[in-house]
Amino acid sequence: MNQLEEIVKYVIYKCRENNHPVTETLAAFVTQTIYNPKTDRFYLEDKLTASQVDELKATVLQKLSQIDKPNMKTIQMQISYDSAYIESEIQRQERIKNQSIETGKLTDEVVSLEIKNAKDFEGLTVLFKKIFNFLLYKNKELMYDGTNKTGNQDSENQATQFNIEKEVAAGLESVIPRAALGPFVSLNPSEKVTQLVELSNLVIGIRLFNKWIQKGGIGLVPFQDLLEYEGRDLIERIRQEAFEVIENCDNYTIFFQNVGPGKIKISDEQFKQYKDELTFLRQYLSYILSIQEDVDISENSVDSNQTRYLKEIKDLETLLKQKSSAPKEQVYPKFATLAQAYIQLLEEKKLCLTRVKLFELLQEMRKGFKLTLPRNLILTAKNISQDPSNEEQVEIEYSEDCGIERLLPKNTPDFMQTPLDYLGFCLWSIVKRDGLLLPGKPALGVFRYKDKNCVFSDEKSINEFLSDPQQFIQGVINQCRKNPELIHLLRMDDSFKNVNLNIYVSGQEGGHQLSNKLMVDKGIETPLHFVEKRLDPNYCWNEWELRKKALQMANIRKRQTKACQTILSNFKVDSEAQTYLPKDNETNTGKTEWDIRKFAIEQAKKKGIIAGTDRAPYPIHPRNYITGLRDKDTN
């Protein structure tokens, strides 16, 4: 965790503890823009020690506790407005992106479809369905006008959906019937895409004309709803608000021009209070004028498209009046123009509703801000400015060899289109009067130094700038460090890239940048097979084993049991059984045969079976062998 994250988390926790929570964006911006008077830099521009970190934490908490101060109100307005603007732009880009992706998929299905030839009926039928799906999606896009999330109130009605499909199918059949798709098949991919776009405009134009004559166009936003809706008077509201803010700015400008020795005297605290109030008004006016510029462009677009739409409707009524058909060379371009004007009007309505939300956000911020400059001081300043004796005549001491280019209306073509740096405020008053924003006078000349076009409020300021221009260029940066609300107002983001409000707001709290999304690598690991509580002992994951079992089961179903069963009829399955070995019938001991016989005789005598030895079971029969008989010599 770096020092910024550590301090921001601590500040957010402490603010919640003190019962005045702040957003992470505000806490981070204030933390990064705390001025260190010892180094004339921001604290976080240098590596901080532990004591400096504690000092910075205390300073941030003290500044956030003064949330009602004019300078903090200005920072709050900058963050709130830029966050809302970026969020609306992200939503609009996401919507356009999703529509483009879906349209691309449907277009690819049509373009990539391969058909044998122009007489392939089945292939042409499939192609016709895919073209119909493309047109149906393009027509359903027009059901959303920005006032709701689901389209018109009857968009979910099945009957309405059916009627939309019916109208789209009829429009497709009238422009290019199914049997006439042969020439479309022979086109190359780019030509097919062009034809699809033109076909979409034609079908939409036909449905728009049918809606105008009240014979169809179900689901389409009525033409009057594109011209009359809440927020259509935004341009008048903005002009009225801008007029009031400009009047207040002029009063503050006259007051500060007459503050000084011999004129109006105020304390330093009052000077800072009124100066910060003027800064808030300048920033508020900048946002108001930015919205007004966008609304003016939008109004011009609405007027031109409204004129085109009504003109094409009138021409189509003339061509198709009391006629069932007309030459396609005359009506097709008008249907296409009608669709294009309608789509642009629909898009302008969505943008206008977004600008209304931004304008209401600014008005809410303005209502919570109170101006404290007394009316009597304003009147005193106006009286002093009307006294001609207070005007000093000073000549501008300019020479061409000073390295500064002077642009005047008489010697510069397109002088009024010259871009002014620092938003056209007097450079001298910013540097010498603690960031005071007084308007410069381009009529005195635009002074270009190091690609910076600077203007000043009087001749005396110009002469001081000409004597040391680098001091003023660097002085603006120093004043932005002391007054961080000027960084965004004076377009000084390039000089403070680490505290660029646009990039910082878009990258915080799950946001994204407008140009490119913030991409990160992220991975997660999960087990291939989760261990289940219930285990199946017969579970088998091997597909080959399952296939083998399936074949065996299918083979068994076709078998029949015979009366005589052999090994061959038993499906060649080896059957084995395990039993105990048979017991031994004989016992081997250490006794001899004579001992056994003697034991048997003794047992027989005990039982009275044998009375004497002559009746023993094994009596001894003596035998005598005589030799030498039959005249044989034994010697």
From Swiss-Prot:
Pfam families: FAP206. GO terms for cellular component: ciliary basal body; motile cilium; radial spoke. GO terms for biological process: axoneme assembly; cell motility; cilium movement; regulation of cilium beat frequency. Coiled coil: none annotated. It is found in: Cytoplasm, Cytoskeleton, Cilium axoneme. Its main location: cytoplasm. Keywords: Cell projection, Cilium, Cilium biogenesis/degradation, Cytoplasm, Cytoskeleton. Disruption phenotype: The mobility of cells lacking CFAP206 is decreased. If their number is normal, cilia are slightly longer and display uncoordinated motility with abnormal waveform characterized by decreased bend amplitude and decreased metachronal coordination. Cilia axonemes display a classical 9+2 organization of microtubules but their shape is abnormal. The keyword Cytoplasm applies. InterPro entries: FAP206. May regulate cilium motility through its role in the assembly of the axonemal RS2 radial spoke. Belongs to the CFAP206 family. This is Cilia- and flagella-associated protein 206. It comes from Tetrahymena thermophila (strain SB210). The gene is CFAP206.
